[in-house]
Amino acid sequence: MEAIILVGGLGTRLRPLTKTIPKPLLPLVNIPMVERMIRNLPEKIDTVILAVSYGLEQMLEYFKKTNVGRKVIIVPEKEPLGTGGAMKNCEKYVTGTTAVFNGDVVTSINLDEMIEYHKSKKAKGTLALWEVENPNRFGVVKLVKGEILKFQEKPPKGEELSNLINAGTYILEPEIISIIPENEKISIERDIYPKIVGNLSLIHI
């Protein structure tokens, strides 16, 4: 099973640290964040695909000399493609059910359970959601009986459909990646998921 980790961002909020080191290689308790993410993956994920833009040479060099116990494929972006475009750029390495992570996610989610839940529901996509007190700075999700019915981007205060936000962790079938347009800068969260609600089953955990 593959996992895609989206590590193409510029890390502007962490400057000046990211002026010289790409954000995925910044240490989190003495281990680069992306390596920590890889080492925490379930054993069933044996291949990790890194969608990389900024800091490509440093990422290539790091994983050339570092054994993380899994096959690592680095897929370069000539220019940032957004979350959806980056996933599409990795499509040729996807063979089936795939876990996808935003590159700055440190999660307590039990991924084995999430994968099994996804398969038991025969879903095309399963999204991890997180409950927050103030969802207005985020995209929120409306649920009915566990199924995602609507996405709402940064709702005005008092107009929120819920207080559940996207946690940046997905289990996806190849059908979802296949409908992303090629060679476009596109957001999976804002441009793709809202369009497929009702056509391809999206659920939450």
Segments (PLM) and residue ranges:
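Conserved beta-loop-beta/alpha segment of the NTase-like Rossmann-fold superfamily
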Residues: M59-K145
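Catalytic-core segments of class I nucleotidyltransferases/pyrophosphorylases
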Residues: T98-A99, V106, D112-K119, E133, ...
